[in-house]
A protein has these predicted regions:
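N-terminal hydrophobic membrane-entry segments
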Residues: 1-166
């Protein structure tokens, strides 16, 4: 009798220990499979754990990890045309990351969960490149070279909106 109870308790403790999942401070765990309410009261099919741990119910839930690390994008555009029709090559670096705020994490989970870091980088890079092409097309070559800081600021401002919606 009591040996059976002890064995059952050990099995339950092991199951709990095996299903308790943790993430570091630079990661978010997205647990999907059951309905949860957001702080705003909206029903969603997942819950979020930032830098901690939680029990993931076997069979009913699945845990995925989303990185909050800074990602560096190497931007290299060839033959981008300015407003005057002059072809220029544009090289630069952009740094992007998923914000640690709940709404930004929910949005990123809906867009990127299950994708590799390389796939996420490629999507962000294509977004930045598209905006970069559009901005270069509105400037002269003199504007680009004389006002590099203003040019970089404009690229950041225009890209930020689309990147935030990802």
């Amino acid at each position: 009798g009591s040996i059976a109870v002890v064995i059952v308790l050990i099995i339950l403790l092991r199951m709990y220990a095996n299903r308790y999942t943790k993430v570091g401070p630079n990661e978010v765990m997205v647990i999907s499979g059951r309905q949860h309410r957001t702080m705003e009261g909206r029903a969603v099919g997942f819950r979020i754990v930032k830098g901690g741990g939680t029990f993931v119910w076997p069979i009913f839930e699945k845990a995925d990890i989303l990185s909050l690390e800074l990602m560096t994008l190497d931007v290299r555009l060839k033959e981008v045309y300015t407003i005057t029709g002059v072809s220029v090559n544009v090289d630069g670096v952009a740094q992007v990351k998923i914000k640690g705020e709940d709404q930004a994490i929910r949005t990123a989970a809906e867009r990127f969960l299950g994708r590799s870091e390389e796939e996420i980088k490629m999507i962000a890079l294509q977004t930045v490149e598209g905006h970069l092409r559009g901005i270069v097309g509105t400037l002269t070559i003199e504007d680009i070279y004389k006002n590099r800081d203003a040019f970089a600021q404009k690229v950041q401002e225009v890209s930020a909106g689309d990147l935030a919606n990802m």
